[in-house]
Amino acid sequence: MAPAEARGALPGWISVLGWGLALCSLCGAGPLWSGSHEWKKLILTQHWPPTVCKEVNSCQDSLDYWTIHGLWPDRAEDCNQSWHFNLDEIKDLLRDMKIYWPDVIHRSSNRSQFWKHEWVKHGTCAAQVDALNSEKKYFGKSLDLYKQIDLNSVLQKFGIKPSINYYQLADFKDALTRIYGVVPKIQCLMPEQGESVQTVGQIELCFTKEDLHLRNCTEPGEQLSSRQEAWLAMEASTHGMMVCEDGPIFYPPPTKTQH
């Protein structure tokens, strides 16, 4: 179940290497898309811990609610590597950070390394916007958007709960579009050898740069340059995810270690 504090906030409305890179703090390769670090939208990315754990095959217990992966400006990364992460800047947010933005793979280690990675790679670019121009603002606003979206409760409202039975991708799409009024991006782990169905792992909802209002993640007729397409392809492969295909989809229940 989702933590109680995250409910009721809606106003009406994922290879081992891949995930290791996505959640590490020592990723040295720079992005293909650098340019002037300009970006057009923010992507609030939430992932399903049981799927993350399935991919890396290293978690003992998985959380049973969607958690934050990051708040990412599209097309821009590592905008200011001299702007170092300082845990003291977000000490007032730590309680919520530990609940809603955990490192789901390395839960018993220094979880702040995950936050450091997200700040250096994404937060320093998001800081172009006044509402996100400090560590505290970036992480605080990310938490606010997470609670506002309240993905856990929305899926449950439509009867979409972790199950050994399969859903259709359309079940997820229809529920999210109906509540949020925008087109999200739903990402899956593709079936491995011996498997017959994709596994949902990540959901992205996008926001405008100017006022942080919900918007479609992809607009009809939107054209990307070959460089931007290469950047997006690299991002997807790094996270071990691909856009889900139409058809059946597995929403895996959490796993618990027998003690």
From Swiss-Prot:
Disulfide bonds join 53-59, 79-125, 188-244, 206-217. The lineage of its organism: Eukaryota, Metazoa, Chordata, Craniata, Vertebrata. This is Ribonuclease T2-A. It catalyses: a ribonucleotidyl-ribonucleotide-RNA + H2O = a 3'-end 3'-phospho-ribonucleotide-RNA + a 5'-end dephospho-ribonucleoside-RNA + H(+); an adenylyl-uridine-RNA = a 3'-end 2',3'-cyclophospho-AMP-RNA + a 5'-end dephospho-uridine-RNA; a guanylyl-uridine-RNA = a 3'-end 2',3'-cyclophospho-GMP-RNA + a 5'-end dephospho-uridine-RNA. InterPro entries: Ribonuclease_T2_eukaryotic, RNase_T2-like, RNase_T2-like_sf, RNase_T2_His_AS_1, RNase_T2_His_AS_2. Its EC number is 4.6.1.19. CDD domains: RNase_T2_euk (cd01061). Ribonuclease that plays an essential role in innate immune response by recognizing and degrading RNAs from microbial pathogens that are subsequently sensed by TLR8. Cleaves preferentially single-stranded RNA molecules between purine and uridine residues, which critically contributes to the supply of catabolic uridine and the generation of purine-2',3'-cyclophosphate-terminated oligoribonucleotides. In turn, RNase T2 degradation products promote the RNA-dependent activation of TLR8. PANTHER family: RIBONUCLEASE T2. GO terms for molecular function: ribonuclease T2 activity; RNA binding. Keywords: Disulfide bond, Endonuclease, Endoplasmic reticulum, Glycoprotein, Hydrolase, Immunity, Innate immunity, Lyase, Lysosome, Mitochondrion, Nuclease, Secreted, Signal. The active site is at residues 69, 118, 122. The keyword rRNA-binding does not apply. It is found in: Secreted; Lysosome lumen; Endoplasmic reticulum lumen; Mitochondrion intermembrane space. Glycans are attached at residues 80, 110, 216. Residues 1-29 form the signal peptide. Belongs to the RNase T2 family. Inhibited by Zn(2+) and Cu(2+). GO terms for cellular component: endoplasmic reticulum lumen; extracellular region; lysosomal lumen; mitochondrial intermembrane space. One of its GO terms (biological process) is innate immune response.
